[in-house]
């Protein structure tokens, strides 16, 4: 078959018009050094800071250090497939993480990959892990309470929604227990929780996840894990990923609580990466911007203005001190960034006073305005009573020579210290806390043996549940002690005390 000249020309024209050159331009670089979770590459001239990069082995990397003739890349995974001469290409996007309701109840790594074996996470939204914190105009002062369920904290060091409250202390003083108790106490509230484990042992993290499952707390909790065996880049990213997940709830008019356990290990991971990419070391070999590392993270916790949905993100960072040295570099940095600290003391812990909170050194700088009125009414004298007791404690051995007023102060103090003790993972509703502290500060415990105070407290809760449910409900609703509540409260305590056998 022969084609006419004109037909052949038309076919050729249409073919040329529909011809597409499917050329995809990619900017690539070449790795010239790799080791310890860090690679250096040349050729990535237009790369952005914190841009996600991809190695030819399939591993992801993050542009961490931008220099004149090379890029320092932190490897987000195994470096085993990356060698000198490997190709690394730009993706053109900043590192982001999945966010949203789909992550509730899941355990993930800092890149958003599931670790719990419950299948893929089909998140509808993604958000950059590094974000600028809300400005002054977008914020509202902290005014709603975030109840921890721990008597000593809710009474004397109250925390509000949108606050940053540091939990600081030596190893094995109960820091994680305080944070987990706070998560457990959000069970019947509208607060979503995020627990970020940074550099923790896998067995410890597994135990915490099991506890959260057992107590029904995983229904509203997301766990982000970068364990001790994970490379430093993942430990560095973990808190930022957790914060991004919490910000999704904050920005959608909801409330979230995030626990960073702990930021000491986070600073160490950052120090390791900074030294490997040859950033100049400063005090304790930390880089000069380690303050900014934590300030930009913790400033993202905020209470937003009503026009923006009135959401909040509350942060509980944990710092581990060495031999009680609160004046070390990282502890002082984080103390100055946060809105107060809860200081846990080994001496108190070893004496059996748990939670081992040193009330003198602990403070909440903004939470007072968030405390419910009923708690303010009963706990007003509590801190003062305990301070007077601590002053006179040294004279206890001379008990027989003391005047009656001093003896009464010591006796009241001993009972209050006993009353503030609390077992782990057993948060108490705030209305019951109010009644117990009212009993302590109004002399109901003064003639009860110190050894029976805990028994008195536990039996009192049972008695109230059985006989004075209306009083608990009224306290919960009114959140204040008016004359009617006060008379019911006195009646309940008098009745219970008459039937109590120490």
UniProtKB/Swiss-Prot annotation:
One of its GO terms (molecular function) is proton-transporting ATP synthase activity, rotational mechanism. It is an enzyme of class 7 (translocase). It catalyses: ATP + H2O + 4 H(+)(in) = ADP + phosphate + 5 H(+)(out). ATP binds at residues 169-176. The record marks 362 as: Required for activity. It comes from the Bacteria. One of its GO terms (cellular component) is proton-transporting ATP synthase complex. InterPro entries: ATP_synth_asu-like_sf, ATP_synth_asu_C, ATP_synth_asu_C_sf, ATP_synth_F1_a_nt-bd_dom, ATP_synth_F1_asu, ATPase_a/bsu_AS, ATPase_F1/V1/A1_a/bsu_N, ATPase_F1/V1/A1_a/bsu_N_sf. It is a peripheral membrane protein. Keywords: ATP synthesis, ATP-binding, Cell inner membrane, Cell membrane, CF(1), Hydrogen ion transport, Ion transport, Membrane, Nucleotide-binding, Translocase, Transport. It is found in: Cell inner membrane. Its EC number is 7.1.2.2. Produces ATP from ADP in the presence of a proton gradient across the membrane. The alpha chain is a regulatory subunit. F-type ATPases have 2 components, CF(1) - the catalytic core - and CF(0) - the membrane proton channel. CF(1) has five subunits: alpha(3), beta(3), gamma(1), delta(1), epsilon(1). CF(0) has three main subunits: a(1), b(2) and c(9-12). The alpha and beta chains form an alternating ring which encloses part of the gamma chain. CF(1) is attached to CF(0) by a central stalk formed by the gamma and epsilon chains, while a peripheral stalk is formed by the delta and b chains. NCBIfam families: atpA, PRK13343.1. Belongs to the ATPase alpha/beta chains family. This is ATP synthase subunit alpha. The gene is atpA.
